[in-house]
């Protein structure tokens, strides 16, 4: 019995060792968020000058079905001011075909073309804020915990997204209030990830590579979002969005 316990402990140690080696060998990307005091017209387009001056995160890597670069290009840009985080995602799609099985907020219907922003504001690899949209502006938000094992879809705040569908791509422009996110005062950086579900190609891909044998939302494989101007104080004022039943009575 003692021998079996020792073997079990050794196996646990080796698994932890190999996992930590994998994480340490992982390359973590950096994306830079520029501070802007310009007004932003939320319309799903990046025609404001600052968007085109900001570097884009590219080269998304598949987490499913293969371990390779995504076949369709995705770009992400972030800017911020004193009150909001703005994110712009351009998802290329050579087929011009999209799967949109539901328009209901926080819908759990599978098979949806979508992009997801994830912010680990305390950089603890345990919790993150989740914001999802799709080509027609579906809104889904959630709290991710336990390193990515648990996703609480009951969390709802007020935020905005506008989208635009062009020839061979769609775009999502997000506006997320800072007073709805908890973060350390004066934050200079967060851990960050972007996920894309491309139903036409059958690919799930991420901005910062997540190995194919790991779950897509594993917080241990986030990259870094770096603010050129540190954020102010966290002034979290959570506003809950009530659900409205679609059943006619």
Residue locations for each model-derived region?
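N-terminal secretory signal peptides that target proteins for export/translocation
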Residues: 1-7
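Bacterial N-terminal signal peptides
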Residues: 9-20
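Structural preference for beta-rich elements and adjacent junctions enriched in aromatics
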Residues: 25-249
């Amino acid at each position: 019995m003692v021998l079996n316990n020792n073997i079990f402990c050794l196996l646990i140690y080796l698994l932890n060792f190999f996992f930590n080696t994998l994480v340490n060998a992982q390359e973590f990307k950096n994306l830079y968020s520029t501070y802007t005091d310009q007004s932003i017209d939320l319309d799903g387009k990046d025609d404001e000058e600052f968007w085109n001056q900001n570097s884009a995160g590219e080269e998304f890597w598949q987490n499913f079905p293969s371990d390779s670069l995504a076949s369709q290009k995705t770009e992400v840009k972030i800017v911020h001011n004193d009150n909001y985080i703005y994110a712009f995602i351009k998802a290329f799609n050579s087929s011009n075909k999209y799967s949109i099985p539901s328009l209901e907020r926080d819908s759990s219907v599978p098979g949806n073309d979508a992009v997801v922003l994830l912010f680990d504001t305390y950089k603890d690899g345990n919790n993150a804020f989740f914001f999802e949209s799709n080509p027609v502006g579906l809104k889904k938000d959630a709290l991710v915990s336990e390193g990515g094992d648990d996703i609480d879809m009951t969390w709802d705040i007020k935020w905005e997204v506008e989208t635009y569908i062009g020839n061979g791509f769609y775009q999502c422009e997000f506006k997320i209030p800072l007073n709805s996110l908890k973060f350390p005062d004066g934050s200079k950086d967060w851990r960050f990830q972007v996920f894309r579900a491309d139903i036409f190609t059958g690919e799930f891909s991420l901005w910062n590579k997540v190995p194919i044998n790991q779950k897509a939302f594993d917080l241990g494989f986030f990259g870094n979002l770096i603010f050129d101007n540190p954020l102010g104080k966290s002034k979290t004022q959570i506003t809950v969005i009530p659900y409205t039943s679609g059943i006619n009575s």
